[in-house]
Amino acid sequence: TLLASMIYYGKILYFKDKLIPGYSDAEKIGYTADEMEWARTNEEQIWRYFIEHEILFDTDANLQKRFINLAPFTKFRLQLDSESPPQLGQYIGWQIVRQFADKHPDLSLQEVLQKDDEQIFKQSNYKPRKPE
């Protein structure tokens, strides 16, 4: 599913959080500072898009291309596409894994990485950050 891929890549990025804590989030995901700012500012709208279009549990391979794979931008099929950074599915997956880990500080890195996607998603109670 799209969600499984999001959390898979979210785990990789969370691992980077622990492995290279001195690096910025933008460096970890490969974004420019502007792309990182765009992702943070629009996190709530990105999440709303996934929910409203009911694509989290979809297995359509095209969703991987649109939201996970490297491309010049993420393909929402909206006017804002060309402004968006690539791989926003990975970015949202990262935020889900981070919220899960924050809610379970007793778990080791290995335990977090070994949790299945469904557990991480449900127990994260993911809520996108509000734009500042």
Regions found by a protein language model. Give the residues of each.
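Flexible, glycine-rich surface segments
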Residues: 1-82
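C-terminal soluble interaction/assembly domains
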Residues: 57-132
